[in-house]
């Protein structure tokens, strides 16, 4: 046990560095970072188990920061562990700096997650805890680890905390400990201006162990963490009552603590100088680590060497006794695409693509041992039950299955899947109706930003949902998701792969592409209704190029018809009428424009030549295909919300028929 005086000195060191980072950048959030310094100091100097020499060690504890605006606290603490230099701290929020305003995942530097909008970070941690339980059920003690999360008042207020709290408690995630930095201050008001809820009772109702402490007392923090580590059968919430801007002084040297002004702005001028002096630092040279604090963290580094050596020795014995499991561990954490015998999948002609997806999922359930699939209370409708029937759902104390029943909580489910991917060792997929992807957009964006290969399964892909009416009929959703194919990630690649297959066989290819995509998230968009298969003799492997010819390979067609999903079969029906008039037709299925645009210009021009007359049909907004049809093209799409009626009636009323394809193309060619 470290002396309280030393622990307070180390926490003050973090406060000085955090306040100075914000001051130098003239931008940032010092108050929360100063208040939370005591907890992260105790955690990193006494509890968190990791290998400083091997940051990617799969058996490490993981720390997820929810309030990304408190990044100065995390960077400063990691600097004490040797992961950041003082110069890098001083470059906070600057171009090219490794210390951006909100943390971005960087395992080598100890940053486990990109901290997105409040509420997501701790939900990532719930997903990581689920992944750890799943892996421990298969691999044993080598995955015996603790997942820590840090949440603020704002994160508690975000609606997603309801889903994360409920799910973690329901599953009894006793490998999960969350610190709630309860300082009663947020950006524009005190928390009592917006809430009077009893947070402790709320989490207790979700079956959490709740411990309330003075969050600035290192002895109380240590005791709480020790108690939490011993808890079984439930996650633990440590409510730390902290002081916003702890140690901060105003220009007149009066207290600047518990003040909203310190939340999101530099302390400034004399207030900053007085604060650094009050904390025992040098305002003229604030970027330094005190000698005794260096010694504290050097001591922890030596402790970690011994702890990790014991862990590695135990792993070596386990590997010797379990060579097959050891090989699986290595493969699963490699991030490589799994081997799947795609040839065993037998699709039924004319099936809905959601049903075709179920057949694929049934094979994946048996062939991909580290895959976890989740559904937001729709498994029998989104057809993820094809996977569930080959395994069973997680329950408290039983993670031998591979299915997460997330309940009606789409954003929570998505963020949990991101957390699973961040943990590593598992392949995560989640499903709901396409219209409910609206609830998932924040997580989709974060998956793209972090380059996480999560598989998003969205069924009931268009107005053909039918009788449920416009609230459940996606129209604009496809355009929104396809924008992610146009948005580049920081590696310069399409930030997402979006696939909407045209029939059952193309669905198998889409799933193959999704499973082989290990560098970005994938969207799989499937139909509710049955779809006629593409013309006989089609080479489905060409779907891997994003767009390909499925009928009419004439070198000089009079018109090219383009669509994705179920509209391709409508084009084929319309083409039969057009051919009777002697019109030469080429039909192109385009499951992914992003993938198509990544092909060579030569290939693109061979499918849709520059200047060709192109007609596009989409059950979404016309913009879905405008990039493919070009200046000489025309798109018939849906430009309004849908209606409640049987889907075949809607096809007729909205113009998604062979006859209207014929009429539209004839008008275009006139």
Model regions: which residues?
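Short acidic, Gly/Ser-rich segments with clustered Asp/Glu that frequently serve as metal-coordination loops
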Residues: 154-160
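Small/polar loops that bind or transfer phosphate-bearing groups
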Residues: 65-66, 152, 213, 240, ...
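Non-catalytic, alpha-helical, charged scaffold/linker segments
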Residues: 276-307
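Residue-level marker for buried hydrophobic side chains located in beta-strands
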Residues: 149-150, 178, 374, 615
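Thiamine diphosphate
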Residues: 1-146, 295, 301-525, 530-532, ...
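Conserved beta-strand elements of the Class I
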Residues: 148, 372, 560-562
């Amino acid at each position: 046990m470290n002396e309280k005086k030393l622990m307070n000195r180390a926490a003050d060191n973090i406060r000085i560095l955090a306040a100075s980072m914000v001051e130098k950048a003239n931008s940032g959030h010092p108050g929360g970072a100063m208040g939370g310094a005591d907890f992260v100091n105790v955690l990193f100097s006494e509890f968190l188990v990791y290998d400083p020499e091997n940051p990617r060690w799969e058996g490490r504890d993981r720390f997820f920061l929810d309030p990304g605006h408190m990044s100065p606290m995390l960077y400063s603490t990691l600097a004490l562990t040797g992961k950041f230099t003082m110069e890098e701290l001083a470059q906070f929020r600057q171009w090219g700096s490794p210390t951006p305003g909100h943390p971005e995942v960087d395992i080598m530097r100890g940053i486990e997650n990109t901290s997105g909008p409040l509420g997501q970070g701790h939900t990532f941690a719930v997903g990581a805890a689920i992944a750890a339980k799943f892996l421990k059920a298969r691999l044993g003690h080598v995955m015996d680890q603790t997942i820590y999360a840090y949440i603020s008042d704002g994160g508690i207020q975000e609606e997603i905390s309801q889903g994360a709290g409920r799910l973690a408690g329901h599953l009894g995630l006793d490998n999960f400990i969350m610190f709630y930095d309860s300082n009663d201050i947020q950006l524009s008001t005190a928390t009592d201006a917006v809430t009077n809820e009893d947070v402790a009772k709320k989490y207790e109702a979700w079956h959490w162990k709740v411990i309330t402490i003075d969050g600035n007392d290192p002895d109380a923090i240590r005791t709480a963490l020790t108690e939490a580590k011993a808890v079984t059968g439930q996650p633990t919430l440590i409510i730390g009552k902290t002081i916003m801007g702890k140690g901060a002084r105003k220009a007149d040297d009066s207290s600047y603590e518990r003040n909203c002004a310190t939340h999101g702005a530099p302390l400034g001028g004399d207030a900053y100088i007085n604060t650094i002096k009050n904390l025992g630092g040098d305002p003229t040279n604030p970027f330094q680590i005190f000698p005794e604090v260096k010694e504290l963290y050097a001591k922890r580094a030596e402790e970690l060497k011994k702890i990790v050596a014991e862990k590695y020795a135990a792993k070596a014995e386990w590997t010797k006794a379990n060579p097959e499991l050891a090989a699986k561990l290595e493969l699963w954490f490699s991030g490589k695409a799994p081997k799947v015998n795609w040839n065993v999948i037998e699709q039924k002609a004319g099936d809905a693509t959601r049903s075709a997806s179920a057949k694929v999922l049934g094979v994946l359930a048996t062939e991909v041992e580290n895959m976890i699939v989740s559904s937001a209370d729709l498994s029998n409708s989104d057809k993820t039950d094809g996977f569930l029937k080959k395994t069973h759902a997680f329950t408290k104390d039983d993670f031998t299955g591979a299915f997460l029943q997330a309940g009606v909580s789409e954003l929570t489910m998505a963020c949990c899947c991101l957390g699973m991917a961040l943990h590593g060792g598992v392949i995560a997929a989640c499903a709901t109706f396409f219209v409910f992807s609206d609830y998932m957009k924040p997580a989709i964006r974060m998956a793209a930003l972090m380059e996480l290969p999560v598989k998003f399964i969205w069924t009931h892909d268009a107005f053909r949902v039918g009788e449920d009416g416009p609230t459940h009929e996606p129209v604009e959703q496809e355009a929104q998701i396809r924008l992610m194919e146009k948005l580049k990630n920081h590696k310069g690649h399409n930030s997402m792969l979006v696939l909407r297959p045209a029939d059952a066989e193309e669905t198998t290819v889409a799933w193959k592409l999704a499973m082989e995509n290990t560098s970005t998230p994938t969207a799989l968009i499937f139909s509710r209704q049955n779809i006629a298969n593409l013309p006989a003799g089609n080479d489905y492997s060409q779907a891997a190029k994003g767009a390909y010819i499925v009928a009419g390979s004439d070198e000089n067609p009079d018109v090219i018809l383009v669509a994705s999903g179920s509209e391709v079969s409508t084009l084929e029906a319309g083409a039969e009428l057009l051919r009777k008039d002697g019109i030469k037709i080429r039909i192109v299925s385009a499951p992914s424009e992003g993938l198509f645009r990544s092909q060579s210009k030569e290939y693109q021009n061979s499918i849709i030549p520059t200047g060709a007359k192109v007609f596009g049909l989409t059950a979404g907004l016309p913009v879905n295909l405008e990039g493919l049809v070009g200046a000489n093209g025309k798109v018939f799409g849906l430009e309004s919300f849908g209606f409640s009626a049987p889907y075949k009636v809607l096809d007729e009323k909205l113009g998604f028929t062979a006859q209207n394809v014929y009429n539209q193309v004839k008008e275009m060619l006139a």
